[in-house]
Regions:
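FAD-binding core/adjacent interface of flavoenzyme oxidoreductases
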Residues: 1-6, 57-142
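Beta1-alpha1 glycine-rich phosphate/pyrophosphate-binding loop at the start
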Residues: 2-59, 140-169
């Protein structure tokens, strides 16, 4: 059986591992260049055994089946009733079974309750995590965080640890 998994985060990796263990041929497609999903941008502990998201992602990657194909930097554009997936770049993949493991994302930047067009220097928490934890870009400060939920508090803690003034609203 050919299984197509859309999404290379924790759920996609677990699905690939399980399917390969049952003798299935597996392809995992993800829009990012690396497996791991949102875990890759999570530098805070809390993923079991006091591991960060990145450390947890690394442990998942170690268990990613060598026989599974990973197709990075690719988006599934459409899935046909004939069980053909059309991918960005013009490629097509036939499959017997489809697993959607696309995870979740925060509210799109344009949907945030900020008046006017989005000026430079305003980011979502996810964008900020990606900038800081994946690309090493540190805000010059001071930083104002709109929202004091879990992610806002995590970001405030991370920014304050760098001695950058931070305010939660």
């Amino acid at each position: 059986m050919n299984i197509l998994i859309i999404g290379g985060g924790a759920a996609g990796i677990a699905a690939a591992k399980s399917a390969c263990a049952r003798g299935c041929k597996v392809a995992v497609v993800d829009r990012k260049p690396r497996l791991g999903g949102v875990l890759l941008q999570c530098s805070h502990p809390g993923f079991g055994a006091n591991r960060t998201g990145t450390e947890y992602a690394d442990s998942l990657l170690e268990s990613f089946p060598k026989e599974a194909a990973f197709i990075p930097n690719t988006t599934v554009l459409s899935v046909e009733k004939t069980k053909i997936a059309r991918l960005s770049g013009g490629r097509e993949l036939a499959f017997s079974c489809l697993i959607l493991a696309t995870g979740c994302r925060e509210i799109p930047a344009g949907a945030l309750p900020i008046a006017g067009t989005r000026p430079q220097g305003i980011y979502t928490a996810g964008q900020m995590q990606e900038m800081m934890n994946l690309h090493g870009i540190i805000p010059p400060g001071p930083v104002v965080i709109l929202g004091s939920g879990d992610i806002g508090l995590i970001m405030a803690d991370q920014i304050a640890a760098l001695d950058i003034p931070v305010t939660l609203v």
